[in-house]
Amino acid sequence: MIIHPQFDPVLISIGPLAVRWYALSYILGFILFTFLGRRRIAQGLSVFTKESLDDFLTWGILGVIFGGRLGYVLFYKFSDYLAHPLDIFKVWEGGMSFHGGFLGVVIAIWLFGRKHGIGFLKLMDTVAPLVPLGLASGRIGNFINGELWGRVTDINAFWAMGFPQARYEDLEAAAHNPLWAEWLQQYGMLPRHPSQLYQFALEGICLFAVVWLFSKKQRPTGQVASLFLGGYGIFRFIAEFARQPDDYLGLLTLGLSMGQWLSVPMIVLGIVGFVRFGMKKQH
């Protein structure tokens, strides 16, 4: 079993100011978005100009931050924040939702498109290939922080990783499983899936490769965005089987996690959109 290195979440600290790895992962994601966006402009495969790309980035950042935070509040810990509403503003304590951030970016795309006279689906198609590497960067941030770890796996599995940060969850899990209790007593922690790395590979690298390559040719309007939508939903749904469910939610109906249920509409809309838009002539 590999032991998580327990990286210091703070990269640089100068007096009261601290630069955290997780914040850096977001910044890297926005840099990658801009870099890929400029490549697409140079290839003639974008509705952006260099100036409008920089303008949209501001809209996108606001969509990610506000949507991600609001999504976390509504989807994951609504009752807690309802009891302590001021905690919503404590973003430094963590708590962001991809699905909320996605909805925030969709709203930003709609508003930006209206302002600049760009069709919503055309703009979605342009933005979609630029996003996955940013998601990959975010998952590396999760791994460095030692958060969002995976479910318990076999002690002899080559991928098994112990997370010292999961001490409380390990104790709770071992209390209901004699074999896990034995492992915990012997090794001091339980072997878990490094699910952050699975999500890095699936939602980040694989999704980027699929959407980027598919969008290198002109496609029917809406089809690239649909591929991203369905692709992310499928990869996230799969990865969630290895990810530890949120302790304050657990597994929901049919034994699925909140992340899986939120991904189901993405999968359905993505598949329907991909087929429907693909049947239309390119325009």
UniProtKB/Swiss-Prot annotation:
Keywords: Cell inner membrane, Cell membrane, Membrane, Transferase, Transmembrane, Transmembrane helix. It is a multi-pass membrane protein. It is found in: Cell inner membrane. One of its GO terms (cellular component) is plasma membrane. One of its GO terms (molecular function) is phosphatidylglycerol-prolipoprotein diacylglyceryl transferase activity. Its main location: membrane. InterPro entries: Lgt. One of its GO terms (biological process) is lipoprotein biosynthetic process. The keyword Membrane applies. It is an enzyme of class 2 (transferase). The chain crosses the membrane at residues 17-37, 56-76, 92-112, 117-137, 194-214, 222-242, 255-275. Pathway: Protein modification; lipoprotein biosynthesis (diacylglyceryl transfer). Its EC number is 2.5.1.145. A 1,2-diacyl-sn-glycero-3-phospho-(1'-sn-glycerol) binds at R139. Catalyzes the transfer of the diacylglyceryl group from phosphatidylglycerol to the sulfhydryl group of the N-terminal cysteine of a prolipoprotein, the first step in the formation of mature lipoproteins. Belongs to the Lgt family. This is Phosphatidylglycerol--prolipoprotein diacylglyceryl transferase. The gene is lgt.
